[in-house]
Amino acid sequence: VLRPLLKACREGLRLETDYVSFTTPVAETRLIAPHTLVYTGMRWHVRAYCEKNGAYRDFVLSRLRGEPDVLDISEFSREADTGWNTRVNVIIEPDQRLTAEQKRIIEIDYGMQNGQLIVPSRGALVQYVLQRFQIDANKVESKASAQQIVVANLDALQPWLYH
């Protein structure tokens, strides 16, 4: 799987590959134009243009089936991937419901400066940053001691979150 994938990334080529997902659990042929391998801290993905969906997507490497076939040059490059090329900061703060003493503990735990941890990211990778910090953008824990940290700029990150 890796050899054709790396060749396609390096040379800007399209691939034909079988892929499974939660929404399509039976292998389905996809034509993709991969540009970058990404390790999220939990698993490997390839960032690629998906011809089926007409958009740049992340494909989990372990869900590729069989060996991909290398095709021709792709018109969809890394430079055209807005999500990849947009730089954003994920700003993490202690949950405001904590006491001042508890906030200070969290600030030290996470190496925060002025009560914030600023995590630079690409737009396309924001969701993985939140997962790494175990932050669910759609849920607030009822107890601040369970939540501990929150995203201060969640509204600005909405375009990059899965909905």
Briefly describe each language-model feature range:
Residues 1-163:
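Short glycine- and basic-residue-enriched patches
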